[in-house]
Amino acid sequence: MSVKKKNTPLDRYRIYLRLEKGLSLRTLEAYMSDVEKFAAYIAEEGGDLLAVELEQLRDYLATLVDVGIHPRTQARLLSSLRSFYGFLKMDGYIESNPTELLKSPKLPMHLPDVLTLDEIDRVIDAIDLSQLEGQRNRAMIEVLYSCGLRVSELCNLKISDLYLDEEFIRVTGKGDKQRLVPISPRAIAELNYYFNDRDHIEIKPGYEDYVFISERRRKPLSRITVFHIVKELVGDAGIQKNVSPHTFRHSFATHLLEGGANLRIIQAMLGHESIATTEIYAHIDRTRLREEIFEHHPRNKHCKNNK
């Protein structure tokens, strides 16, 4: 019986990390995961992992910035790529290391905070459902995190934008550009609970189609109101981080990337698609977009584990 040899560059790099570097399994898998994310990105771009050029690396890092990936995560990903391409050069796969000319991302004095899934659950658990606005706020947080919306997109979301049976919502972003974004079953459930309460609000004429309504003003929530609601809920949850509505968008992108989602799809879901990205994904149907997000979003994994 013959033993199949592992001779791909990624296979040999894994062996190198385990045997020569002596890394723990957890650290080894972290390195491999980072490199595999980049390998998937290069493959989607039609490139060759062994013939990567400096400009491709810069585009990758620029895309990480574009989708709001935490600077520390950016720095870690680059460190992993430096290690991988250093190995490829040492082992004779390539003549020069393309990462040598790349500068590490500068870490600002104050880094944007990202919430863990546990912290997001704590924020939701801190909501008092006995209050009139309780279920609205619960649905609001779930939609922010499930869909990675900007606060302005949340405030402008309309009932006519919801395709809940298909598990999609239509989002109008900057420049009035529209995109379809998958919405999780949990967020859909919270919205349906909220709509039961919303039916009892006498909404001012002209605003009936807006999803999130202020009970007191009987009009759509403003951005400032959402900001204050989030601040209050985070304080009630005992979380000592600087959190705004945008934090949920950062967390959405970071958790998807860490979970292995396709970087270009994350970019498209956030409404940051470039002309090139739009061309690349023009042929991808809604089913793939939905499956990609649902497979890698920790909220959906969390739901599956509790079924």
Residue spans for each PLM region:
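Conserved catalytic core of the tyrosine transesterase superfamily
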Residues: 1-307
